[in-house]
Curated annotation (Swiss-Prot):
Post-translational modification note: Phosphorylated by MAP kinases.
Note: The variability of the residues taking part of IgE-binding epitopes might be responsible of the difference in cross-reactivity among olive pollen cultivars, and between distantly related pollen species, leading to a variable range of allergy reactions among atopic patients.
PANTHER family associated with the record: PROFILIN, PROFILIN-5
Name of protein: Profilin-2
Top-level division of the source organism's lineage: Eukaryota
A GO molecular function held by the record: actin monomer binding
Disulphide bond pairs: C13-C118
Organism: Olea europaea
Record key words, sorted: Actin-binding, Allergen, Cytoplasm, Cytoskeleton, Disulfide bond, Phosphoprotein
Signal peptide range: none
Taxonomy of the source species: Eukaryota, Viridiplantae, Streptophyta, Embryophyta, Tracheophyta
Length: 134
């Protein structure tokens, strides 16, 4: 399966039981910052933003004082899973990032999508990729 199909079919799809509700943007990005696939709405990010995210996975808490930045948008870092998931909040929306062996799975949402729904969509694909050795 092509990486774009994972983004289109598993991240940017309707959320189970909530037809018409879907993530605002999504992507799969390699640990080196190379974009494997992304939605048309995924923000253009800077290398230093990706470096900060990777540092936080290796040194949990790194982003807490400054916030998580992606495409110039600042998210307040909220509870995640050290080394596995980073979650951020901004107003009525937020971001979930799941780390796999080779990639980062990003989901960005706005209401009416909830943080829990975003977490479910992103982490389900991330867990699947981990099971596949990716």
């Amino acid at each position: 399966m092509l990486w774009q199909a994972y983004v289109d079919d598993h991240l940017m799809c309707d959320i189970e039981g909530h037809e018409g509700h879907r993530l605002t943007a999504a992507a799969i990005v390699g640990h080196d910052g190379s974009v494997w696939a992304q939605s048309a709405t995924f923000p253009q990010f800077k290398p230093e933003e990706m470096n900060g995210i990777m540092t936080d996975f290796n040194e949990p808490g790194h982003l807490a004082p400054t916030g998580l930045h992606l495409g110039g948008t600042k998210y307040m870092v909220i509870q995640g899973e050290a080394g596995a998931v980073i979650r951020g909040k901004k107003g009525s929306g937020g971001i979930t990032i799941k780390k796999t062996g080779q990639a980062l799975v990003f989901g960005i949402y706005e209401e009416p999508v909830t943080p829990g729904q975003c977490n479910m969509v992103v982490e389900r694909l991330g867990d699947y990729l981990l099971e596949q050795g990716l």
